[in-house]
UniProtKB/Swiss-Prot annotation:
Protein name: Sulfurtransferase Alvin_2599
CDD domains according to UniProt: RHOD
Disruption phenotype: A mutant strain lacking rhd_2599, tusA and dsrE2, although not viable in liquid culture, is clearly sulfur oxidation negative upon growth on solid media containing sulfide, and shows massive accumulation of intercellular sulfur globules.
Naturally occurring in which organism (per UniProt): Allochromatium vinosum (strain ATCC 17899 / DSM 180 / NBRC 103801 / NCIMB 10441 / D)
Pathway: Energy metabolism; sulfur metabolism
Amino acid sequence: MVNEIDSESLSQRLADTEDVLLVDIRTPAEIAQGMIPDALQLPMHLIPIRMSEIPKDRDVVIYCRSGARSYQACAYLMQQGYGRVLNLRGGIIAWARHGLPIVAPEG
């Protein structure tokens, strides 16, 4: 079973400067529309070959548009031995609905 976090709880953890890595697994076209500040851009299909960029020793929150793809990505990472992954429930849609910050991607 995949552990999940809601937008408000994640926002609070980030405000408290907790050591959380955000990973945006959406496509580059989706990311171009905006992303959560300071998130690592790692399209879902590249996770198997770029897994080494995801630390096992800190909490990692994976998100996509609605939370469905990120749920699958979390399940995959858990199968690979990652115990500290969380799915952002409702994805960036829920984040935006709560009025939380979205920024343009760098580069």
